Amino acid sequence: KYNSSSSSSSSSSSSSSSSSSSSSSSSSSSSSSSDSYYDDSSSSSSSSSSSTGMIWPVGSSSITSYFGYRSSPTAGASSYHRGLDIGASAGSSIWAAASGTVITASYNSAMGNYIVISHGNGVCTVYEHCSALYVSVGQSVSQGETIAAVGSTGISTGAHLHFGVTVGGDYVNPLYYVSP
């Protein structure tokens, strides 16, 4: 469960715009105190939006691990996977699935470099294992804006994006919100 109250900032930003933006951010990585995945040249996504208005967050559609119970590739036992693992080349662009405000841009020993974006109405998206973060806490981002690069930081078996969605602090299946 992601606890947004552990973040240094939160937002009431409004939500899931379905129009893509081509703006790009070049700010350097920032950290919050919170500890609680192939289009390498593009600065914004051209993906179509789902019925929820969110877009797929990377150029690759290769889902390597689904939401829910699974045999863990790192723990050697069954575990509950709180998102989708999407295989992609290291350094590939990661795009904001919807417009919102960055509430966490940090490092965690399990998630590696990660970002949490609040989209309003209790909906947040989570992007883990990034090699680089291009946004900072409090920054407004547009749907399709490049926010990070795919990596393998934290507990990871290779380059991928772990993409999660929370509603009211509880993880839900991201495929309810996005489709490859």
Sequence positions of predicted segments:
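Catalytic cores of peptidoglycan-degrading enzymes
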Residues: T52-P180
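Alpha-helical oligomerization segments with coiled-coil/rod-like character
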Residues: K1-S50
